[in-house]
């Protein structure tokens, strides 16, 4: 039996039902050039905790960080053999919830930093703002409104 033209052009592959589904997201990797500078930013500016660090079999230096109240980890990877990291603007970002954008803004000011964009208030009392992390990655900070995110 021949396939119809629509079946041949279908951009969504049909894999069938998985035998075993994933359980949860464990970590997301971000490659960086200056591992220590980036680790210090995430720890001192955002308050993340270093969970572990090691060297991979391929020679990458890896540091795993955890945000308060989260299970998922951020894996920072420095792999000099791969060449310098060049992050495309507006391609990727991490988003973190904060209690208060105003309070976090004061924290930034105390560190000699500032928001790169925002804060922008929403009608429900929440808002968003952005800061630039080392290596060109963007960090979105979200203050939940009365209705939630």
Sequence positions of predicted segments:
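Vicinal oxygen chelate
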Residues: 4-21, 24-34, 53-54, 63-68, 83-149
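Short, charged/polar, Gly/Pro-enriched secondary-structure boundary elements
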Residues: 70-74, 136-139
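Core segments of cupin and vicinal oxygen chelate
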Residues: 29-71
């Amino acid at each position: 039996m021949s396939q119809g033209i629509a079946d041949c052009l279908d951009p969504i592959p049909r894999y069938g039902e998985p035998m075993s589904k994933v359980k949860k997201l464990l970590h997301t990797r971000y490659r960086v050039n200056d591992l220590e500078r980036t680790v210090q930013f995430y720890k001192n500016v955002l308050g993340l905790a270093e969970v572990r660090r090691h060297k991979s079999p391929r020679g990458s230096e890896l540091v795993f960080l955890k945000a308060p109240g989260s299970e998922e980890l951020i894996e920072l990877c420095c792999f000099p053999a791969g060449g310098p990291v060049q992050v495309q603007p507006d391609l990727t970002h991490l988003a973190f919830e904060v209690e208060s954008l105003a309070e976090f803004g004061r924290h930034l000011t105390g560190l000699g930093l500032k928001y790169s964009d925002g804060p922008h208030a929403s009608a429900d009392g929440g808002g968003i703002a952005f800061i630039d992390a080392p290596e060109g990655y963007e960090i979105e900070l979200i203050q939940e409104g009365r209705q939630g995110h």
